[in-house]
From Swiss-Prot:
Belongs to the class I-like SAM-binding methyltransferase superfamily. RNA methyltransferase RlmE family. Its main location: mitochondrion. The keyword Magnesium does not apply. The gene is Mrm2. SUPFAM superfamilies: S-adenosyl-L-methionine-dependent methyltransferases (SSF53335). Residues 1-24 form a transit peptide. This is rRNA methyltransferase 2, mitochondrial. The keyword Mitochondrion applies.
Length: 246
């Protein structure tokens, strides 16, 4: 699968809010309710003020503040990176642009099925399916020394509306990342992935416990309270000494 390397910085503009307002008319009651909540969301407003591409940036900012996931000099693989908000945070925290001359310079690689607008300090591989073996090989080629210190994932499958099916798909995506870690994640590294609470959550947690020394469930304030979304933070990767899926 062909990917596109994006290195040039462009002004960061939040377009979603403007687009939503322009198309407010002609929506259903449920859509009006969602849009009203969206426009009142303090994290949406803060993202616009601080030039983050979407509100999810504040999830990573909070988790990083509490758990020190990112630091200057680290190599980061951001899976499900579009529209690029997590990559923005990662670029800042690992000093990927070299803005701080007194600190090590890190690296950020973002991968997504969707197009991502260029961001200074980040390399984007898109459109690309992280589960495709060809994408995997391209990731290895792009990562410095073919390794990442941190794997971030805010990925989610296209929703079917069938909760159990969507949950199963997301768990499968997360397990794919754990499988990839054997060849990508540096020993001692970190994996942070989004999941939805459900019947198979324990399978993912069990696998992470086998592969990492420490695993915890995190629910940042920016995650909506009514959402089943949680993040699994696994640290101190054992280096593939756990049990790989058949």
């Amino acid at each position: 699968m062909a990917g596109h390397l994006k290195l040039v910085g462009v002004p960061l503009k939040v377009r979603r809010l403007h687009t939503a307002v322009c198309h407010y008319r002609g929506r259903t009651g449920a859509e009006h309710l969602w849009l009203t909540r969206h426009l009142k969301d303090p994290f949406v407003k803060a993202a616009k003020v601080e030039s983050y591409r979407c509100r999810s940036a504040f999830k990573l900012l909070e988790m990083n503040e509490k758990h020190q996931i990112l630091r200057p000099g680290l190599r980061v693989l951001d899976c499900g990176a579009a529209p690029g908000a997590w990559s923005q945070v990662a670029v800042q925290r690992v000093n990927a642009t070299g803005a701080d001359s007194s600190s090590p310079v890190g690296f950020v690689l973002g991968v997504d099925l969707l197009h991502i607008f260029p961001l200074a300090g980040a390399t984007f591989l898109c459109p690309a399916d992280v589960t495709d073996p060809r994408t995997f090989q391209k990731i290895l080629e792009l990562l410095p020394s073919r390794r990442a210190d941190v794997i971030l994932s805010d990925m989610a499958p296209n929703a079917t509306g069938i909760r159990d099916l969507d949950h199963d798909k997301l768990i499968s995506l997360c397990l794919t990342l754990v499988d990839m870690a054997v060849d990508i994640l540096h020993p001692g590294g970190t994996l942070l992935c989004k999941t939805w609470a459900g019947s198979k959550s324990h399978l993912l947690q069990k696998r992470l416990t086998q592969e990492f020394q420490s695993t915890r469930v995190v629910k940042p304030e920016a995650s909506r309270k009514e959402s089943s979304e949680v993040y699994l933070l696994a640290t101190q990767y054992r280096g593939g000494k756990g049990t790989r899926r058949p």
